[in-house]
UniProtKB/Swiss-Prot annotation:
Protein name, per record: Ferredoxin/F(420)H(2)-dependent CoB-CoM heterodisulfide reductase subunit B
Subunit structure: The ferredoxin/F(420)H(2)-dependent CoB-CoM heterodisulfide reductase is composed of three subunits; HdrA2, HdrB2 and HdrC2.
Cysteine-cysteine disulfides: none
Role: Part of a complex that catalyzes the reversible reduction of CoM-S-S-CoB to the thiol-coenzymes H-S-CoM (coenzyme M) and H-S-CoB (coenzyme B). Catalyzes the transfer of electrons from ferredoxin to CoM-S-S-CoB during methanogenesis from acetate. Electrons transfer from ferredoxin to CoM-S-S-CoB via HdrA2, HdrC2 and HdrB2. In addition, the complex can use electron bifurcation to direct electron pairs from reduced coenzyme F420 towards the reduction of both ferredoxin and CoB-CoM heterodisulfide. This activity may take place during Fe(III)-dependent anaerobic methane oxidation.
Pathway the protein contributes to: Cofactor metabolism; coenzyme M-coenzyme B heterodisulfide reduction; coenzyme B and coenzyme M from coenzyme M-coenzyme B heterodisulfide: step 1/1
UniProt EC number: 1.8.7.3, 1.8.98.4
Source organism per UniProt: Methanosarcina acetivorans (strain ATCC 35395 / DSM 2834 / JCM 12185 / C2A)
Required cofactor(s): [4Fe-4S] cluster
Location in or out of the cell: Cytoplasm
Length: 300
């Protein structure tokens, strides 16, 4: 199994440090060799830098990759956006000698060189390929009696030819990891729809972003689930704090709990909600919190 450096990104340490803690606890329990990546910067955001200034995007992304190369480790992300930016940059630099040379001319100014010796992994992709659902089940100590609305997000599965995760229009690999915890992944209308956060939509087109989110939340609520599970802190932010904005704009009363997969897995591995930072969410659904505390205490 590959040795990893953990790339935290921006939203995790600044808004949801519980996701970082949950990820580290899970990796330790699963006996995965993962350490921090000192000196890392923003990935940078793929929908912004890559679209407007490709050379700067590659220089910034490659710097992060080189930090991990120097450690002799692959990079592990817990964010779809970071994964999209770093993985796409890595692929581009490995397959375009001219762009690699141009990028290395920039890196040379800070004493660095991109060699292409590190791979970029996403926590979901890594767990699915390196452990798999069946092996993951052997680590579960607290099966979760939860009904879950799973959100894949965009950059985890696309561009499909570069992700190598099989079917991308109706994927099942993430569902299988969710169900390895004992939870039930419930199908719902427009499951594969974007949450409305990425591509500059949340920051540049707030009204449209909230309309997309409200539609998705309505579909999820109609499915009768206990919570939403995602694999991206930006999607997590959209579903969590975005519910408050949706309620204010549309007069709705959404209060659907939101978990990153690391937090869901952490519960199934026997860690408490407090250890996993679940209380850091803006949405605090008392009924759901009571349920997961009971599950954690072995009362369900």
């Amino acid at each position: 199994m590959a040795k990893l450096s953990l790339f935290r990104g921006c939203i995790v340490p600044n808004r949801y440090p519980g996701i970082e803690k949950a990820t580290k606890l899970c990796l330790q329990k699963l006996e995965v060799d993962a350490v921090d990546l000192p000196g890392a910067s923003c990935c940078p955001a793929p929908g912004v830098f890559k679209s407007f200034d490709k050379a700067t995007w590659l220089a910034l992304a490659s710097r992060n990759i080189v930090l991990s190369e120097r450690m002799g480790r692959d990079i592990l992300t817990v964010c779809n956006g970071c994964y999209g930016s770093l993985a796409d940059a890595n692929i581009e630099l490995k397959n375009d000698p001219e762009m690699k040379a141009c990028t290395n001319s920039c890196l040379k100014e800070i004493g660095m060189e991109y060699k292409g010796t590190a791979e970029v992994r996403h926590i979901i992709e890594f767990l699915y390929k390196e452990l798999g659902p069946e092996k993951l089940k052997s680590f579960i100590t607290t099966p979760l009696d939860l009904k879950v609305a799973l959100h894949y997000g965009c950059h985890l599965i696309k561009p499909s030819k570069e992700r190598n995760l099989g079917e991308t229009e109706a994927p099942v690999f993430f569902d299988e990891l969710v169900e390895a915890t004992g939870a039930k992944s419930v199908d719902y209308t427009d499951k594969m729809m974007c949450c409305g956060a990425g591509g500059g939509v949340r920051s540049g087109h707030a009204a449209e972003s909230l309309e997309m989110l409200e539609h998705k939340l309505a579909c999820i609520r109609n499915a009768g689930v206990d919570c939403i599970v995602n694999a991206c802190p930006f999607c997590h932010l959209q579903f969590d704090r975005g519910q408050l904005a949706v309620n204010e704009k549309f007069g709705t009363d959404y209060s659907i709990p939101v978990l990153h997969y690391s937090q869901l897995l952490g519960l199934a591995l026997g860690f408490s909600p407090d250890e996993l930072g679940i209380e850091q969410n803006a949405i605090q659904n008392i009924e759901f919190l009571a349920k997961i505390y009971e599950i954690s205490a072995g009362l369900r």
